[in-house]
Amino acid sequence: MMGCGFHFPWFFFLIIGLQAPLSLSLTSQGSALLKFRARVNSDPHGTLANWNVSGINDLCYWSGVTCVDGKVQILDLSGYSLEGTLAPELSQLSDLRSLILSRNHFSGGIPKEYGSFENLEVLDLRENDLSGQIPPELSNGLSLKHLLLSGNKFSDDMRIKIVRLQSSYEVRLKKSPKLSPLAVLGCINRKLGHCVSRNRIIQVKKVEAIVFRIKATSRRFLKAFPSFLEETDIYKRRELLEETSNLAAEPAPSAPSPSPGIITEASPRSSGSFPAVTNAKKRRPPLVPPVPSPDKGSTSPDISKNQPQDNKQSKGSKHVWLYVVIAVASFVGLLIIVAVIFFCRKRAVKSIGPWKTGLSGQLQKAFVTGVPKLNRSELETACEDFSNIIETFDGYTVYKGTLSSGVEIAVASTAIAESKEWTRAMEMAYRRKIDTLSRINHKNFVNLIGYCEEDDPFNRMMVFEYAPNGTLFEHLHDKETEHLDWSARMRIIMGTAYCLQHMHGMNPPMAHTDFNSSEIYLTDDYAAKVSEIPFNLEARLNPKKHVSGDLEQTSLLLPPEPEANVHSFGVLMLEIISGKLSFSDEYGSIEQWASKYLEKDDLGEMIDPSLKTFKEEELEVICDVIRECLKTEQRQRPSMKDVAEQLKQVINITPEKATPRSSPLWWAELEILSSEAT
């Protein structure tokens, strides 16, 4: 007994030592967050009330914290009126990708340690009381894409410092909706990509880049005119005065007087080697005295001969300058108009006239964002007072409806019934979802055909195509549904591949947020229709929600990546050819189950027993593609374009054959009207 009592403490400490590494990551992350909490002097809304030592093992449930696989990926405390200083210890969050602290009252400077983030992509410090200089260490952040600093109190030489930072990411310094030169520079360096504004991500218009280049081109063109060379002396002087890189200097003691033909204005500051001109009024050339009026009967003198020659030249140069300015301005204006028209025609959805038959009321309004806005009353009639429920999900319900033309629709309505529960962030996510879905427009996709938003009574809805034959999951695993033969399954595989290829090929690429057999619906002729979750807002909007699982598929703040869809497509093909669930308690994941057959090339053993026939050549190619799609390293996986091309070489199903043979009426009308509009 004594021996046991003697060894027990050592055994106890051994257990603790083994468990320590498991919580080390959480402890280090929690310590960094608690040090940030200690620097917050005022928390009027109690946002950080659940940030405490006792809950350090549950830090993924702390307000504003979003985790993926137990690692802090996002810290979003925007708009909580927090006061204090920024904690340099946040740089210890090595997996942090987004740090959003905008619209608070943080003071002091930006810690130089923020340049040591390894994976940080977004640093948003807008509308605080930060001051001092931007630390040059921020240039060390190789992964930083968006740096937002407007609405602070940085020193005047901030622009000089920020120029030294890398121009591979976008910088936002001003509140003005106009882009600052630095922001424009950043955008041009990124091939006119997306720049970050105060409230949203906006597309930099190509017109601005064209105007930027026209200025330099027109300047070189005008140098051919002598009058322009005379007038540019004062213009250059003013430009130099406005450059922030020219530091203030005292006026030179013996500043040369300007040429007689140029009138300069006094300026309170000077620029480097160009002294400011003071007391300009005293340096103006004397006015030409008036010519006395001639006596009656006497011949009028030739006034032009009495005027100085330089006055003639001055008037002439002014007239030439005026004509040149008008000509150049007209030319630039014409180019801007042409560029705007070209840009709008390229970026915007083609203008389509209202449907001519079968639709009434709001459905006949012109398109605004690619889809029409509908009335609740019209949808209520179509869905029989919202009594025809297809399915209820976590956060939204899907109803079936029929329009007056006979077209069947599916209406997804959020479960939130009061406007006070619908936050601003939810509204932004809702509109972003509409914008995203409205741009896909593929015949193997469950397309968005309308939306409804009203506040009295409150509702937010999306209207989709209706696929009457249920989901692929039901046909593969429910014995009561109709059996799918080998040809039907191959058509579903190809239709799905073409749809994902289209989504990944968009600009910017769009990846499916949760790709699986339950998100693939079938039409009357068993063509595949890929659907997207309309209201998946909880993970984005609930700061206490812990996000787990595959980062690429479940995180909404961090957009999904196409490589994750490629992996899911490989799992889907296994599910289609084998008829087995993607996960089962019996055999685990379908990948583990299939690995032994894929390694030994014993492919026939994987075939669904309910299939009477199958094509061995197609099966071999499918299994080759599956091996590529399921590779652990994302970079080694093929693109969906390569996947579709490889499958198409053996499976003779073109995109036209993979689409529904009987398109819904609204698709047919849309195609007719599109051809008429063009």
Curated annotation (Swiss-Prot):
Extracellular compartment segments: 26-323
Residues modified by glycosylation: 52
Gene3D superfamilies registered for this protein in UniProt: Phosphorylase Kinase, domain 1 (3.30.200.20), Ribonuclease Inhibitor (3.80.10.10), Transferase(Phosphotransferase) domain 1 (1.10.510.10)
Residue spans of biased composition, Polar residues class: 296-311
Source organism superkingdom: Eukaryota
Protein's job: Involved in the pollen tube perception of the female signal by binding an unidentified female attractant. May be involved in the regulation of root hairs development.
GO CC annotation, single: pollen tube
Protein family membership: Belongs to the protein kinase superfamily. Ser/Thr protein kinase family.
LRR repeat residue intervals: 71-94, 95-117, 119-141, 143-164
TM stretches of this protein: 324-344
Signal peptide: 1-25
Consequence of gene loss (knockout): Short straight root hairs.
Primary localization: membrane
Localization of this protein: Endomembrane system
Catalytic activity, EC: 2.7.11.1
Protein's membrane topology: Single-pass type I membrane protein
Protein name (record): Protein MALE DISCOVERER 2
